[in-house]
């Protein structure tokens, strides 16, 4: 399985189609049509990243790790929670994409994350969400559940990636695709940051919805994480069907679990 080391690539700008200064002045509708054209040409392989002029990304997040490959960024949300499913997202961005606001979802406000989600969904070449339930987490453990959620997201992409980059330091191979794990990748690469934002916002909405049915655990605020209010709710009212029973729900730490590679 080929695994590529991290490189200091710069953000690309597509020169065959427009000059940047002129692009900034055109209408939103024309800009959208150009974006759709670039997506189509990228998917069809009509140009490569090496054919594009490289430029520094204003937010210092790099657009791509692999050169000349259709690349999907992956990240998960909810791994450290006591309750709820784990969500993962895979995102393929256009080859010259540059959104200065993208960052690790944990560093953004809830309002900003929702605004960025709309932009990512609009602009992405492809994106998809994978979900693993609490019952599955208890059966296979949270690490393997995180990998499974990413695989499920990749399965649902409408465009098949040629390479994968993943936030973190561990991953299980997906089909025959090359992949790279990147520690704190959601603060380094735009596609991982985009995946982080989608996974976080979709999971937060899921936790808000089940909080209506189970209001005892303060899920609207803690989203299932082990806060004092959450654990006091468990102590007073017992567990819900959404709790991960393989976790030490009332302790200060989670049960140690043997993770499989």
Locate predicted features.
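Positively charged N-terminal leader segments that act as targeting/secretion signals
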Residues: 6-17, 21, 30, 40, ...
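Intrinsically disordered, low-complexity segments enriched in serine/proline and basic residues
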Residues: 13-16, 45, 50
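Cationic, amphipathic, low-complexity segments that mediate targeting or membrane/lipid association
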Residues: 24, 31-34
């Amino acid at each position: 399985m080929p695994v590529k080391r991290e490189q200091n690539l710069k953000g690309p700008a597509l020169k065959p189609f427009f000059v940047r200064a002129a692009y900034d002045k055109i209408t939103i509708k024309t800009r959208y049509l150009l974006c759709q054209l670039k997506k189509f040409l990228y998917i069809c392989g009509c140009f490569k990243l090496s054919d594009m002029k490289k430029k520094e990304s204003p937010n210092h997040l790099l657009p791509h790790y692999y050169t000349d490959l259709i690349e999907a960024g992956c990240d998960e949300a909810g791994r450290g929670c006591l309750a709820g499913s784990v969500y993962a997202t895979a995102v393929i961005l256009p080859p010259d994409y540059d959104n200065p606001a993208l960052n690790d979802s944990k560093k953004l406000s809830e309002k900003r994350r929702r605004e960025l989600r709309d932009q990512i969904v609009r602009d992405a070449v492809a994106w998809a969400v994978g979900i693993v339930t609490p019952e599955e987490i208890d059966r296979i453990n949270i690490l393997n559940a995180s990998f499974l959620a990413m695989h499920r997201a990749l399965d649902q992409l409408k465009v098949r990636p040629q390479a994968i980059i993943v936030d973190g330091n561990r991953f299980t191979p997906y089909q025959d695709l090359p992949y790279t794990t990147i520690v704190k990748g959601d603060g380094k690469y735009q596609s991982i940051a985009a995946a982080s934002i989608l996974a976080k916002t979709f999971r937060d909405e899921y936790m808000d919805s089940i909080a209506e049915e189970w209001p005892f655990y303060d899920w609207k605020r803690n989203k299932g994480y082990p806060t004092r209010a959450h654990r006091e709710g468990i102590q007073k009212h017992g567990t819900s069907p959404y709790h991960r029973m393989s976790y030490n729900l009332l302790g200060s730490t989670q049960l140690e679990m043997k993770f499989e590679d």
